[in-house]
């Protein structure tokens, strides 16, 4: 019977545990080993991997694909430590043994660390502890990588615009049209930036319509010639109702980019894309939707912030902006100061769901709840007779 010797601790520790690495940067750390009794160590090895993989079931068929970004192997040595026979290290209890390692990430484009429903981009370092007559022990530690996306390139700083018109009918009878045209100042944004929307809406149909805008994430997975697409609305803003025969305009209506992962556009099996949808809800008909592509970057320079602030200054100011106190005071309640058309919907709201918690139809189409007054307290004495007796 073989008795397995217990290892007290065996772990991978990075020199900078919170760091997010980029292409060409060095990943450094150490493998720490502690034993409970005298133990002979044959070798300590590491394997560093970076891989994108997708997996889902298409009926009875398994759709699976992988793409390697990184693979590095090395056998680690202790500095100034005596070795026993056959170049083995003799470890004793009470001591901490540290094996240092380091490697550089590839210079080419790397997939940003990501975890989705049907795929992920993952990076890790796995350490192996080899002992004679003992099973190999393993430990694993993940680290994050971000492929830098510079949003200050000429292509991403150029304005984006689109327009669309939809004819509306009722029981195959023409009922006018709804049109929308929109423009944003740039295509590339970073977390915390404001997207300033300039849009014009025209409603010549007999119905009351509602304009909205939303930031949408689209995850695309590709494997075995099959494609899987998931779309989710991250945040949104809405405007006022537009009655029949009227027009409306947005001049710098803003929508903030929340904390989201940068776009992943260079991976052949997994893509993370973002869009600004500007759409009009038409009761009893399909929505009129404009699709403006966005690129969410990982690097925001001064020009990005300056452009955003300049656009915001020229935009329409709401009453919220005009009521900022001169002296600091306790912050007011969010629901008290933010108008309904500026409130963000839940991040888990499905894309363009009609039941997103807001009433798209005109307010007079919803009958207010009428409450009757409660009946008076019952009494066997007629108040009229009582009044006549008093007189």
Curated annotation (Swiss-Prot):
- Give the InterPro entries listed for this entry: Arrestin-like_C, Arrestin-like_N, Arrestin_C-like, Arrestin_domain-protein, Ig_E-set
User: Keywords in UniProt for this one?
Assistant: Cell cycle, Cytoplasm, Disulfide bond, Isopeptide bond, Phosphoprotein, Transcription, Transcription regulation, Tumor suppressor, Ubl conjugation
Q: Give residues where Phosphoserine occurs.
A: 361
Q: The cross-link Glycyl lysine isopeptide (Lys-Gly) (interchain with G-Cter in ubiquitin): at which residues?
A: 212
Keyword check for Disulfide bond: yes
The family database entries (Gene3D superfamilies) matched by this protein are listed as: 2.60.40.640
**What Gene Ontology cellular component terms go with this record?**
cytoplasm
**Protein family membership:** Belongs to the arrestin family.
Under the subunit heading, UniProt states: Homodimer; disulfide-linked. Interacts with TXN/thioredoxin through its redox-active site. Interacts with transcriptional repressors ZBTB16, ZBTB32 and HDAC1. Interacts with DDIT4.
Protein name according to UniProt: Thioredoxin-interacting protein
Q: Native species of this protein? A: Sus scrofa (Pig)
Organism taxonomic ancestry: Eukaryota, Metazoa, Chordata, Craniata, Vertebrata
The gene designation is: TXNIP
